[in-house]
């Protein structure tokens, strides 16, 4: 069934909570098939993952110097994927976004994704930047020389899967001891770390005494706040209206333990006004 014109101008945003990586991959493939058939509009899946290392198409054995079994013994799975890029880490407290979108120019899409992340971070405080001119290994978003967001995508029949991961308040230690993003000396950072560092610098410059309890960030809780800003920024970057939808509207069954996508009938009727995301 063709999409109504109204839906063609929307970005559907779906919050999936915390999902195992392979279950999220199955959901992406399910939603991608629907998007390729024009049974739903461009869609942004937002979620977190339990600890996992994922390999992109350019990742090699050198990225995990101690071997995959060592990392699995520490409780971190290792999964090969069809996305671009090299090795990265996902874990609790990191915001992962999987846009399932019809695109024409993948390079423009990557640049727009970087710009959307930069804009969302700017609303929270850190001045982030792209290093796109320094080569493919520098794809992503940086605060100074520190990487705060990774990007890797796959395009099939004009529709994207995979996407971005922004370090919000996740543990950065798992990035140590691996070669993340193909950059042996890369320094990773997070939104929480940058906000904390900014407060310390402000205290040092004003001579104010350091407090055991730092002032609360502008919006709490941090991850939920940034997720809202990221969805708004991403929709705005693509000139689309964002609309919150449930997993069931996408034909996703999240009631079973595995959280796998099911081929349930898609509800293509316009979302009720109550589901509109305030922006």
Predicted regions and their residues:
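A hydrophobic, small-residue-rich beta->alpha segment in the mid-to-C-terminal subdomain
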Residues: 173-235
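Generic non-transmembrane alpha-helical segments
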Residues: 116-124, 225, 229-240
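N-terminal lobe of the biotin/lipoate ligase/transferase fold
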Residues: 1-142, 147-148, 177, 201-210, ...
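A short beta-strand motif that forms part of the nucleic acid-binding face
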Residues: 59, 155, 166, 182
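Conserved phosphate/anionic-ligand binding catalytic regions in large, soluble enzymes, centered on
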Residues: 157-172
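Residues immediately flanking
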Residues: 48-50, 155, 168
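Beta-strand scaffold of nucleotide-dependent catalytic cores
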Residues: 150-152
């Amino acid at each position: 069934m063709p999409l109504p014109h109204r839906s063609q101008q929307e970005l559907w945003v779906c919050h999936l909570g915390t999902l195992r990586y392979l279950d999220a991959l199955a959901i992406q493939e399910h939603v991608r098939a629907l998007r390729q058939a024009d049974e739903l509009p461009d869609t942004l899946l937002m979620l977190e993952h339990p600890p996992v290392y994922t390999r992109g198409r350019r990742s090699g054995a050198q990225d995990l110097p101690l071997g995959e079994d060592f990392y699995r013994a520490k409780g971190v799975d290792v999964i090969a994927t069809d996305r671009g890029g090299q090795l990265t880490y996902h874990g609790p407290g990191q915001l992962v976004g999987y846009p399932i979108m019809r695109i024409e120019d993948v390079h423009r899409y990557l640049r727009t994704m970087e710009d959307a992340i930069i804009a969302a971070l700017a609303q929270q405080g850190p001045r982030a930047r792209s290093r796109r001119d320094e080569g493919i290994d520098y794809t992503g978003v940086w605060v100074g020389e520190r990487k705060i967001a990774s990007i890797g995508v796959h395009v099939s029949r004009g529709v994207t899967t995979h996407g971005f991961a922004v370090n919000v308040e996740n543990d950065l230690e798992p990035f140590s001891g691996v070669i993340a993003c193909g950059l042996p000396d890369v320094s990773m950072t997070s939104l929480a770390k940058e906000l904390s560092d900014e407060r310390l610098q402000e205290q040092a410059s004003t001579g104010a005494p350091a407090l055991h309890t730092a002032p609360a960030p502008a919006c709490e809780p941090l991850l939920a706040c940034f997720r809202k800003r990221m969805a708004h920024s991403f929709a705005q970057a693509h000139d689309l209206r964002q609309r919150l939808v449930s997993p069931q509207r996408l034909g996703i069954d999240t009631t079973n333990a595995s959280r796998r996508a099911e081929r349930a009938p898609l509800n293509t009727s316009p979302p009720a006004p109550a589901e509109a995301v305030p922006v």
